[in-house]
A protein has these predicted regions:
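Class II aminoacyl-tRNA synthetase catalytic cores and aaRS-like
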Residues: 1-214
Length: 214
């Protein structure tokens, strides 16, 4: 009864013909507690038919900025002594661009796992032996980039390896149409164009099981 997300019920409504649905409610995660995570929290989850991740980024920055304007009378707020400007449009960077900007390691075009490991080693990022290139890029991002995203920023272009439910990019099948929003080094949202290819989805789930077994 303690759900981790309202996802399945909202998706059933989309399939049933309701083109825009959302729920604001409590969710529960059987995970540890730290400054960024709590096992019980309030979340809004949104699904929209005939839209993609670009539409959802626009919706997200509009909701956050307009909420601040309505409640506080301004889109500029101060948190922990730092001024945060919520005015749209927010900054946008791909994960690879962000890693390159803040670490100097550019994973663009890297296809060799050994080379990716060397690049992670160069900036002292730990990784497991089962990690593919996508997970290594994400590890570099989490280790060195997240803490630097103070102003509202959307990170896009997540590797397929860490995004099993997101649709692949038409430009690069190893990258997905996904975004995460960050404010003051905190992830405030996660969204993507939903994968609707059942064959691709099954293959990704099978790959996940193989990785767990390894």
């Amino acid at each position: 009864y303690m759900r981790i997300a309202p996802e399945l019920y909202l998706k059933r409504l989309i399939v049933g013909g309701m083109e825009r649905v959302y729920e604001l409610g409590r969710v529960f995660r059987n995970e540890g507690i730290d400054i960024k995570h709590n096992p019980e929290f309030t979340m809004v989850e949104i699904y929209q038919a005939y839209a993609d991740y670009n539409d959802l980024m626009h919706l997200t920055e509009t909701i956050v900025s307009q909420t601040a304007q309505k409640v506080l009378g301004t889109m500029k707020i101060t948190y922990e002594g730092q001024e945060i400007d919520l005015t749209p449009p927010w900054n946008r960077m791909t994960m690879i661009e962000a890693v390159a900007k803040y670490t100097g390691q550019d994973f663009s075009g890297i296809k060799d796992l050994g080379e990716a490991r060397k690049m992670a080693d160069a900036i002292n990022v730990p990784y497991e032996k089962t990690f593919g290139i996508g997970k290594i890029i994400n590890a570099c991002f989490e280790e060195h980039v997240e803490e630097k995203l103070i102003q509202p920023t959307f990170i896009t272009g997540h590797p397929k390896e860490i995004s099993p439910l997101a649709k692949s990019s038409e430009a690069d099948p190893e990258i997905t149409d996904r975004f995460e929003g960050f404010i003051y080094a905190r992830e405030i949202c996660n969204g993507f164009s939903e994968l609707n290819d059942p064959i691709d989805q099954r293959e990704r789930f099978q790959k996940q099981e193989e990785d767990r077994a390894a």
